Amino acid sequence: MSVSDSTAGPNSVKISGLIEHYTKTLHGRGYGPLATNAYKRAVEHFIAWSAPDSDCVEIGEAPIRRFIDEHLVDCSCAGRPQRGKVTTQSALRHLQAILRANCSIPPAPPSFPVFIISELQDYSDFANDVCGLAPATLISRRQWIGRFLTRIFPSGGLDFSQLGPKGIREFFATQCQGYQPGSTQVVASSVRSYLRFRALRHADPVEALLAAIPQAARWRLASLPEHLNQEELARLMSSFEQADPQRQRDHAIVRCLVDLGLRSFEVAALRLEDIDWKNATLTVRVGKSHRVDILPLPAVTGHAIANYLHKARPATESRAVFVRHRAPLDAPVDAGVIRSVVRQAAARSGLVGRLHGPHRLRHSAATRMLQGGATLKEIADVLRHRSLDTTAIYAKVDLTRLSAIAQPWPGGVS
């Protein structure tokens, strides 16, 4: 697609040939006729509203937001245009991505000012090289640190000599209002990590600032780890009995979560070469501490993976074990897909109130190992906890062993 003439805005493109190029690209990425037609109708609707008498259309954030938030709410366009908000938003995001890929419109504007983006990159290098943060943790911390710096230094420049404890407290009072303790702790950990980075790399005096970061009222080991019992796990696994390629993939994914206690991003990162069929082991290369761990591969888990690879995995050049079965094809699944797999399985098996995401299956794996006689050290090795203190919480759900050491209630019968 060609950019329109110089009198138009930077996000303006010629309408001629746009729809044809758009649908052809979607077909090439594996989108089916129904999805392609729905997206095509949404883009046509946007063009008819945005540029009814022009040969160019502005594909910028402002007109897209007005179209979705204002026009679709009270649309009275003739015919049967695509009016679904979610479908329209997805269709226009795809259009922007396609046009940016061939330089028809400029790249998306950065989330933060340039000086903050540069600082975030320095922090990311430090976090990777020194701290060994998991990718998902680093992404979350970058977002919170970016918001922190944007609020603290709105005029540009990073002058920490001008920042005092009051500024820290005001940021948390505003940003974390109404947050649960766990969410506040995430923000606090991000800001604390960044200030320590400043002290190490730039010798900034941050002691008073660190002391001003609030401590969330969240006590370690205070709660019980939520897990599924054997009957609930059986119901969950029975929801994959349909001989559908995607269900076979999803079954293998959930077996990795239930049998090995893998995290969602670890399952997504598995590659074909990580499976040693001869020795029945699985190599996990993308853990939280950037270690390479070799885990035993249970027979039931290996069978589920082998069944998927031999019978259901689509032809692809990707070396990922688990790949997408819906457009965009020829790409590995990500943590979001795995969360969706678990939630859909929970809905099918009537466990919506009990199973909210993959991490509860990690708790279930640990609890099953404990009930099977494994020691806390063995569980810590499988879950790859760096400290036994992290694993100690599972001792609270071992009722058999707890009953053996329980003392009678004073003055009564236990």
Model-derived features: where do they sit?
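Conserved catalytic core of the tyrosine transesterase superfamily
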Residues: 1-414
